[in-house]
Amino acid sequence: MYLNCHSYFSLRYGTIEPEQLLAIASKNGVQTLALTDINTTAACLEFMRLSSNYDIKPVLGVDFRNGVQQQFILLAKNNNGFQNINAYLSDFLHNSELKIPETAPELEDVFVIYPYIHKKEYHLKENEFLGIRPQDLNHLKFSKWNAFRSKLVVLQTVSFQDKKDFNIHRLLRAIDNNTLLSKLPKSEEGRETDCMLPYQELYNLYEEFPEFLKNTSKILENCNVHFDFQKETTNNQKTYYDSEEGDYQKLEKLAYDGVAYRYPDYDEKVFSRIEKELSIIKKQGFVSYFLINWRILEYARSKGYFYVGRGSGANSIVAYLLRITDVDPIELDLYFERFINVFRQNPPDFDIDFSWKDRDDITKFIFDTFENTALLTVYNTFKFRVAVRELGKVFGLPKSEMDVLTTGKYNLNQLDKLSRLVIKYSTYIEGFPNYLGIHAGGIIISEKPIHYYGATFLPPKNYPTTQFDMHLAEDIGLYKFDILSQRGLGKIKEATEIVAYNHPQEPPIDIHDI
């Protein structure tokens, strides 16, 4: 019966972590639950992955708001609907000047829930409904909508667990508004009753309106989004060329063509190692992964960019032959199985370091070349000291007192009441997501549109960035490409250029010999 649940990924608003939300629902006898965080899908994949542990059917959606003003809730009927919601949300996240309208768009495979406002006019389409909160029931008896009960559903929002959580919610809202708690407007808070109720208690509230319960159940029954979290498959771009067989033939050719460059005096051991690696790479579905890395680095070489291939990929002779790495695994007796094997769950890993001067152009090349591409996010959480400072401001503590609290050099029993509250609630919000950042170098290149998996936002780098992190990406078979920035490579390049300028008679210095 819950169409509007928030996790703590409703940043500086919600207080419940996704798994905790499922545990609370299970305890209250809830069998189907909709996660609809505010203007984000950051928690959706984790929520779906964990839901089977609690025998709860997950429903995915988004609570669209301007600030705290709820406009409407969108629920996905299926994966196509989820993709449509993500694409629509991303339009707003990519352009901060856009405001979410009062009327929802016409999106395929999506249910729309509007919050009921007394005396407001609504013109509802077939897939649109009015959400009736418990406190709306008295007004509804005198509303014309009482005669249109087939379009009315239960809307009990869930943002926190209990009164303690509501206090945390108010503190988060004060932090978000950069104001003293005592001056936080009521309009910036949720309702203290926005908690999950036992199923029977919720049922009793709507006992006079059984149609609402029936309509709500019907919506939840018709929402069926599915993702495969089995790590045996990859959802990276499947092919670099036209077909998987064509890709394999290209990879095979590149590997054997590279023998003359890497091994002028080759022997049978080289070919035996190549055949073994190619067989495993093909079996594990990583042919296109190698080809995409090869294409990126072919471009880098064409531009004269220095780079270093690191990570467990240095164990691969195929990577060495494709000039992805410069480490000879035969000479150093490195085991390919440390990189890829049929029993290893972790994805393959190439860490490619570029000069800080060249990395931006490489990133641009990747986004220009590959269609379904995005940067990966990281969740920047409240660290204890940050929480202390933010809550210190909310409670009006002077900076000198906050400085003492952040050092930890104090006697808790000698602190005044406000300082003790700061310490108390800092331990509660420590670890809560505070804002989304950008992974140091992680890029995903997907077979399906990125919005199939989640919404994207646009950070200062101006490239679409996922709202899920690398761990969730791996859970759904999206393995990142690490394009990293190394200032030292830029300095080495500058040094070789200076040497070449001062000693033009000397042969050019190869960075690989340094």
Predicted regions and their residues:
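Alpha-helical scaffold/interaction cores of sigma-54-like transcription cofactors
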Residues: 1-514
